[in-house]
Amino acid sequence: MMKKILFSITLGLMLVLTSCGDQHKAQSLVKDFLNENLEEGNDCSFERFTQLTPTAMIDMGRVKSMRNDMEHQPYIKSNINYPEGALPDTLMYIRATYKLKGKTGKDEELTQTFYMDKALTKVIAFKQN
């Protein structure tokens, strides 16, 4: 009985630590992605992130639509270099809320959803909420 309790506690602790690591990895990926793809003169400060969550509800048509929509935002660089290849069956997503200070010095609060591969190595698409 004691072994079962110890095993359960160890397993739970491992899941919590893995989850925290993935959350941090996803947040870092989003920050790096925006630092690379915001137009020059825009500065962002992050306020909050939601929990990292899996989804299987995004298809290639929706990905293309999101990419096209975001390309027309004045604070985002055009021609973002997204990963090529087939879309994974399951994507991970996280919402980020941040303040964007543009060239005019005016703050704008933005909330966007970022879709990533399961390994959390690349942003597949993102959208304005």
For each feature predicted by the language model, list its residue ranges.
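Sec-dependent bacterial lipoprotein signal peptides
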Residues: M1-C20
